[in-house]
C-alpha cells in the first residue's frame, strides 16, 4: 500500500473521503492500520487554498470520492507505483519512441487568464524554463518565457511571463570581463527556476546547474540554438500555422505513434509489469482466473493438437515403410510444439530402427523430461541403452558399456536384459583382468630369464676370453723357444762352416787361450746357477706387483742413461768399422746389450712370465740386423764366425768379473732363470753406463794406431780391450756410483720396498743356513 499517495488524497478531499474509506475498506487488513493514522492531522504541507482571482467552483464531487473509496485497494496498491528511474526528458525528445504531441490546451481554446493561473500553480523550484532575453541591465537581464523544458508541458508562449536572472546567477566566461557582455538581446536562454512569487507572479532564474535537481543536473544551461528547443514546442509552432489540424491527425502523423515497441517502452517508463498488468475492473484481475485460461496455456493446447495430427500422419508413413516422409512429419510436429512428447518418442523410435542410437537416446530422454510418466518413452529408452551398451562392448569400451547398462537399470530395475548384460560384462572383465595379470607375470618371468641368460652369456664369454688368452700365451712362449733354438742352431752351423775356412795360424794362436777361459767360466756359471736356484725364494704376495712395476721404472731409468752413451759409440763404430758394429748386434739373442732399451724391457717382461724363454721377435730383429749389414757379412764369412766366437768369450769373461763383485742379495723375479737374466742385464747396464764411453774411447785410439794392420787384429784388440781394460777398482767405483745415482733418482716408497725385500731375503738366507 502506497501510504504517501493515500495521505495526499486525504489532504485533498478531506474528511468526507476518510469516512467513505472507513465504510468501504473496513474488511481490508491494510487499511485498518492506515486509516487510524490517516485520521490524525496530515504531516505534509497544508492544503493550498485557491488563489485569489480564481472563480469559486467549490462543488464537492461525491462521485469521485465514492469511486476512490471503492477502488482504494487497487488505486493505492504498490503495483501501480512506477519503478522506473527518472530520466532526462530532453534526451528522450530527440528519439521518437512514442508520439510527442503539442500541449493539450492549444486544441481546447482555454482563456489566457486560466492558463496563467495554472502555470503559477504547477511550477516548482528546479524546473527548467526557456525564454528570450528582452533587456539587459546592470543587475542582470530579463527574459520572456516561451516554453517549459521539464515537468508539465504548457503553452505559455502568448502569456508574456517574464523572469529575472540576477548578475550573481550569471557565470563569467572570462577572469576580468563583465559576465553580461557575453549575452545579447534576443538570445534563447535555458535556465532553472530559483525562486517563485506566486502572489505577485514573479520568477527568478539561475544559469548555474546547482539550481537543478539531481536527475536534471546533466542538462546544459545558458545560450541554446533554435534546434535545441523541445520537440513539443516546435510542433505547437507548426500547429499555430495550420490551426485546422485535429489532435488525432497530428498524433497519427507523428513517427513515434507507429513504432511497434511503443507499448513496451511506455510500460517500462511508467513501471507497469506487462505479465501481470493491474486493472481497476475486478473481473479482469489476473488472480481471479486459472492459469489454463490464459493465452499461453491455450496456445500450448492448440499447438499440441496440431502436432498430434502430424504425428499420426508420420506413424502411418512409418508403418508403410516411408521413413523419409515419416521423419518430415515428425520434424513438422516438433516445429509446432518443441516439447511434444509423442513426436519425440516417434522420432526416437525411427532413429533407433535406422541405427542412430545416440540420437534416439537424446529424443527419449527429452520426452521423459517433459513427461516422466510416459511408458513408451521409458521402455524404448531402456532397450536403446542396452543395445548401445552391446555395441560399446564389441568395441571393447567396457566402462562406457557398463555405464549404459546402469542407466537402463536406474530407469527400470525390473529390466532383465540390462541386468543379464551387466552380469556378463562383469564376468568378462574379471576374466580379462586375470588374463592380463597372468600375461604380466609371464612377461616378468621372461624378463628375468633374459637377464639371467644375458648374465650367463657374459660369463661364458669371459671364460672363453680367458681360455684364449692362456692359449695365446702358451703359443707365444713355445714359438719364442723354438725361434731361439733355431737361431742358435743356425748361428752355430754358420759359425762352424766359416771356422773351417779360417786361416790356421790365427786359429792356433787364439784357440788355446779361449778354450781355457771358456771352461773356467762355464764351470763357475754352472756352480753359481745352482747356488741361485737353492737360495731363491718366492716373493711376498703383497709386494710382487708393485715391485715389478717399480723394477720396470728402474730399468727404464738405467736404459735411458745407457742408450744415450751407447748410441754415440754405435754411430762412431758403424762409421769406422762396420764389421765390429755388425758383430755387436749379435748378442741380443744371448742377453747382451741391445741398441734400444725397449728391447731389454720387452725381454724382461717375457722372461718374468715364462722361464728360459725369450720373445720371438728378438731373433727376427737379430736376423734383420744381420740382413741389413749383409754387405759387410757376405764379404768374408770367416770374419763373422770369428766375431761370434770372440763375443762368446767376452760374455764368459764378464760373467767371471760379475761373480767376483756380485752382492749376496738374491734377485727377485718369478723364476730363477728370469731373475738371473734380468740381474745380469741390469748389472751390465750399470757397468756400461760409466765405463762404456771410456772403453770405447780407448778402443778408438788403438783403432787409429793400428789402421795399417789387418782387419782380424783390430777385432782381436777390440775384444781383448773389452775383457781386460776394466780393473777391479774401477768396476767397484762405477758400480757404487751407478747405484747411488739410481737411489737418488728413485722415490722414497720404492726405496722402502727394496729395503723390505732385502731384509726378507736375508731372513730366508739365515734360516736356510741354520
UniProtKB/Swiss-Prot annotation:
Residue ranges of domain S1 motif in the record: 126-208
UniProt-annotated stretches for the region Disordered: 36-56, 439-458, 464-550, 569-635, 690-747
GO molecular function: nucleic acid binding
InterPro entries: NA-bd_OB-fold, S1_domain, TPR-like_helical_dom_sf, TPR_rpt, TTC14
Biased amino acid composition, Polar residues: 626-635
Family of this protein: Belongs to the TTC14 family.
Covalent link Glycyl lysine isopeptide (Lys-Gly) (interchain with G-Cter in SUMO2), residues: 723
Entry keywords, A to Z: Isopeptide bond, Phosphoprotein, Repeat, TPR repeat, Ubl conjugation
Pfam family, one: TPR_11
Annotated Basic and acidic residues bias: 590-599, 612-623, 690-703, 711-742
Compositional bias ranges of the Basic residues kind: 498-508
Extent of the TPR repeats: 210-243, 307-340, 342-374, 382-415
Name this protein carries in UniProt: Tetratricopeptide repeat protein 14
Chain positions found as Phosphoserine: 671
Biased composition annotated in UniProt, kind: Low complexity: 476-497
Amino acid at each position: 500500500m502506497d501510504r504517501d499517495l493515500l495521505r495526499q488524497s486525504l489532504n485533498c478531499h478531506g474528511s468526507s473521503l476518510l469516512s467513505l474509506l472507513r465504510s468501504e475498506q473496513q474488511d481490508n487488513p491494510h487499511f485498518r492500520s492506515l486509516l487510524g493514522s490517516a485520521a490524525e492531522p496530515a504531516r505534509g504541507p497544508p492544503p493550498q487554498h485557491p488563489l485569489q482571482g480564481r472563480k469559486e467552483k467549490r462543488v464537492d464531487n461525491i462521485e469521485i470520492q465514492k469511486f476512490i473509496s471503492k477502488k482504494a485497494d487497487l488505486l493505492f496498491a504498490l503495483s501501480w507505483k512506477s519503478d522506473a528511474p527518472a530520466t532526462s526528458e530532453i534526451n528522450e525528445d530527440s528519439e521518437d519512441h512514442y508520439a510527442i504531441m503539442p500541449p493539450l490546451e492549444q486544441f481546447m481554446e482555454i482563456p489566457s487568464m486560466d492558463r496563467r493561473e495554472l502555470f503559477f500553480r504547477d511550477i516548482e523550484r528546479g524546473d527548467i524554463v526557456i525564454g528570450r532575453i528582452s533587456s539587459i541591465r546592470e543587475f542582470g537581464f530579463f527574459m520572456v518565457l516561451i516554453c517549459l523544458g521539464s515537468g508539465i508541458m504548457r503553452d505559455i508562449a502568448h502569456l508574456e511571463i517574464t523572469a529575472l536572472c540576477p548578475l550573481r546567477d550569471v557565470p563569467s566566461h572570462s577572469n576580468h570581463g563583465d559576465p553580461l557582455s557575453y549575452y545579447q538581446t534576443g538570445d534563447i536562454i535555458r535556465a532553472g527556476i530559483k525562486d517563485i512569487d506566486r502572489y505577485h507572479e514573479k520568477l527568478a532564474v539561475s544559469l548555474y546547474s546547482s539550481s537543478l535537481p539531481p536527475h536534471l543536473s546533466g542538462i546544459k544551461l545558458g545560450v541554446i540554438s533554435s534546434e535545441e528547443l523541445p520537440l513539443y514546442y516546435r510542433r505547437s509552432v507548426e500547429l499555430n500555422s495550420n490551426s485546422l489540424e485535429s489532435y488525432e491527425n497530428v498524433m497519427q502523423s507523428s513517427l513515434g505513434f507507429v513504432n511497434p515497441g511503443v507499448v513496451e517502452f511506455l510500460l517500462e517508463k511508467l513501471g507497469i509489469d506487462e505479465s501481470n498488468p493491474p486493472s481497476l475492473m475486478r473481473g479482469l484481475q489476473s488472480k481471479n482466473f486459472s492459469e489454463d485460461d490464459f493465452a499461453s496455456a491455450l496456445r500450448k493446447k492448440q499447438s499440441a493438437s496440431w502436432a498430434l495430427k502430424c504425428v499420426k500422419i508420420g506413424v502411418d508413413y512409418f508403418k508403410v515403410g516411408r521413413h523419409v516422409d515419416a521423419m518430415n512429419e515428425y520434424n513438422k510436429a516438433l516445429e509446432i510444439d518443441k516439447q511434444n512428447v509423442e513426436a519425440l518418442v516417434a522420432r526416437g523410435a525411427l532413429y533407433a530402427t535406422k541405427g542412430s542410437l545416440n540420437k534416439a537416446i537424446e529424443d527419449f530422454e527429452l520426452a521423459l523430461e517433459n513427461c516422466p510418466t510416459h511408458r513408451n518413452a521409458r521402455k524404448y529408452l531402456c532397450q536403446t541403452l542396452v543395445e548401445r551398451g552391446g555395441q560399446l562392448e564389441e568395441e571393447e569400451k567396457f566402462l562406457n558399456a557398463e555405464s549404459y547398462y546402469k542407466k537402463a537399470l536406474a530407469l527400470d530395475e525390473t529390466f532383465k536384459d540390462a541386468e543379464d548384460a551387466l552380469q556378463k560384462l562383469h564376468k568378462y572383465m574379471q576374466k580379462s583382468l586375470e588374463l592380463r595379470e597372468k600375461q604380466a607375470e609371464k612377461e616378468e618371468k621372461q624378463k628375468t630369464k633374459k637377464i639371467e641368460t644375458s648374465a650367463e652369456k657374459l660369463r661364458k664369454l669371459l671364460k672363453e676370453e680367458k681360455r684364449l688368452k692362456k692359449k695365446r700365451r702358451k703359443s707365444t712362449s713355445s714359438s719364442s723357444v723354438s725361434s731361439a733354438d733355431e737361431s742358435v742352431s743356425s748361428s752355430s752351423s754358420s759359425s762352424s762352416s766359416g771356422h773351417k775356412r779360417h786361416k790356421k795360424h790365427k786359429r792356433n794362436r787364439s784357440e788355446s787361450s779361449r778354450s781355457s777361459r771358456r771352461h773356467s767360466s762355464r764351470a763357475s756359471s754352472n756352480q753359481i746357477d745352482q747356488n741361485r736356484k737353492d737360495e731363491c725364494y718366492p716373493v711376498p704376495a703383497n709386494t710382487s706387483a708393485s715391485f715389478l712395476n717399480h723394477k720396470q721404472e728402474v730399468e727404464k731409468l738405467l736404459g735411458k742413461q745407457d742408450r744415450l752413451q751407447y748410441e754415440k759409440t754405435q754411430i762412431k763404430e758403424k762409421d769406422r768399422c762396420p764389421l765390429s758394429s755388425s758383430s755387436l748386434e749379435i748378442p741380443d739373442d744371448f742377453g747382451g746389450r741391445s741398441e734400444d732399451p725397449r728391447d731389454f724391457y720387452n725381454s724382461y717382461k717375457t722372461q718374468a712370465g715364462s722361464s728360459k724363454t725369450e720373445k720371438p721377435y728378438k731373433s727376427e730383429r737379430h736376423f734383420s740386423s744381420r740382413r741389413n749389414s749383409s754387405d759387410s757379412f757376405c764379404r768374408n764369412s770367416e770374419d763373422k764366425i770369428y766375431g761370434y766366437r770372440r763375443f762368446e768369450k767376452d760374455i764368459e769373461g764378464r760373467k767371471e768379473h760379475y761373480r767376483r763383485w756380485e752382492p749376496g742379495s738374491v734377485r727377485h723375479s718369478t723364476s730363477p732363470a728370469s731373475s738371473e737374466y734380468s740381474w745380469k742385464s741390469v748389472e751390465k747396464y750399470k757397468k756400461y753406463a760409466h765405463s762404456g764411453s771410456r772403453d770405447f774411447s780407448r778402443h778408438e785410439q788403438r783403432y787409429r794406431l793400428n789402421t795399417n794392420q789387418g782387419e782380424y787384429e783390430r777385432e782381436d784388440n777390440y775384444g781383448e780391450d773389452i775383457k781386460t781394460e776394466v780393473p777391479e777398482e774401477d768396476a767397484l767405483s762405477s758400480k757404487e756410483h751407478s747405484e747411488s745415482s739410481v737411489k737418488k733418482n728413485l722415490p722414497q716408497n720404492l726405496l722402502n720396498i727394496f729395503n723390505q725385500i732385502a731384509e726378507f731375503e736375508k731372513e730366508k738366507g739365515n734360516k736356510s743356513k741354520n
